């Protein structure tokens, strides 16, 4: 793994049904800690990790937001590779809510070989989280929160990351998951340095993609939310893929109608320096 600063590497930026890009998941890194957040919907996670020079042996922390197929099935592949990786040292810590834990454990118990399951027992530690739990991942301090989804139990998180400036004040990253913001979680997000938010499509394209009928939001909504909550930087993800050619430009423009901070609409494999 190359030497890095505090950064996010977007392994995927698409929604559940994309085929030209990968499902939304990312690597959050400081100079001394790496955490994978979700893993997409299959073994495509292995290709994405390889493309950004992250080895399975580098991954010791994995946060899973929820148990939808496009977030959790790639986790099974990561766990399988940890189990069969001869050079793997230490433990893989997997964090998620009770539904996430049940789904992962059920699948691996049903499909992994006995030899692999024995290695899972040795190398993988499952941490079942409750709403509001605080925990440390290396030099990151995390607090998870229930996003109050009506479709599937899902946790976002607030992360305090070491800052590179002289103030020593931590950088705050808020990851909202892939459904609309709930006011109940304001305290986790307000004033954050960085906010990661889903934008299923442009508001201008709402009649085509039906985001509100699917419990999703738009780039316009994300921009309004970022401005209201006083965050400094906005990262949009979990998008449709039919407008990829102009996605970065158009999503940025729409979010900027209301948000005056910096806006990032990353492509797959793009690195964002925090």
List the model feature ranges, each with a label.
Residues 43-93:
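Active-site metal-binding motif and surrounding structural segment of the metallo-beta-lactamase
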Residues 18-20, 128-204:
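Active-site-proximal loop/helix segment associated with metal-binding centers of metalloenzymes
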Residues 36-40, 59-67, 97, 173-179, ...:
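Active-site neighborhood of phospho(di)ester-bond hydrolases with catalytic His/Asp-centered motifs
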Residues 170, 180-269:
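Cap/insert and terminal regions of metallo-dependent hydrolase folds
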Residues 16, 94, 100-101, 239-244:
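Short histidine/acidic/glycine/proline-rich micro-motifs that form metal-
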Residues 2-52, 153-178, 194:
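Conserved beta-strand hairpin/beta-sheet module of binuclear metal-dependent hydrolase folds
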Residues 8, 38, 49, 66, ...:
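Divalent metal-coordination and catalytic microenvironments
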Residues 92, 97-153, 162-164, 256, ...:
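Metallo-beta-lactamase
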């Amino acid at each position: 793994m190359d030497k890095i600063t505090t950064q996010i590497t977007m392994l995927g930026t698409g929604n559940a049904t994309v085929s030209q890009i990968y499902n939304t998941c990312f690597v959050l890194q400081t100079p001394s800690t790496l955490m994978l957040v979700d893993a997409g919907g299959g073994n495509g996670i292995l290709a994405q990790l390889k493309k950004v020079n992250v080895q399975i042996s580098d991954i010791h922390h994995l946060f899973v937001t929820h148990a939808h197929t496009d977030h959790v099935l790639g986790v099974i592949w990561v766990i399988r590779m940890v189990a069969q990786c001869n050079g793997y040292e230490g433990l893989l810590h997997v964090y998620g809510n009770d539904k996430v834990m049940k789904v992962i454990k059920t699948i691996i118990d049903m499909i992994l070989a006995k030899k692999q399951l024995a290695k899972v027992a040795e190398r993988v530690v499952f941490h079942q989280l409750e709403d509001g739990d605080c925990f440390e991942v290396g030099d990151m301090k995390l607090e998870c929160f229930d996003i109050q989804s009506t479709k599937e139990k899902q946790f976002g998180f607030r992360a305090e990351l070491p800052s590179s400036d002289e103030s020593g004040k931590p950088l705050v990253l808020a990851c909202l998951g892939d459904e609309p913001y709930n006011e109940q979680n304001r305290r986790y997000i307000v004033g954050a340095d960085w906010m990661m938010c889903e934008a299923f499509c442009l508001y201008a394209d709402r009649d085509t993609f039906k985001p509100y009928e699917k419990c999703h939001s738009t780039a316009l909504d994300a921009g309004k939310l970022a401005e209201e909550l006083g965050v400094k930087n906005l990262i949009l993800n979990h998008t449709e893929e039919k407008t990829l050619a102009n996605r970065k430009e158009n999503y940025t423009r729409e979010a900027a109608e209301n948000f005056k901070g910096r806006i990032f609409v990353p492509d797959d494999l793009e690195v964002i320096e925090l």
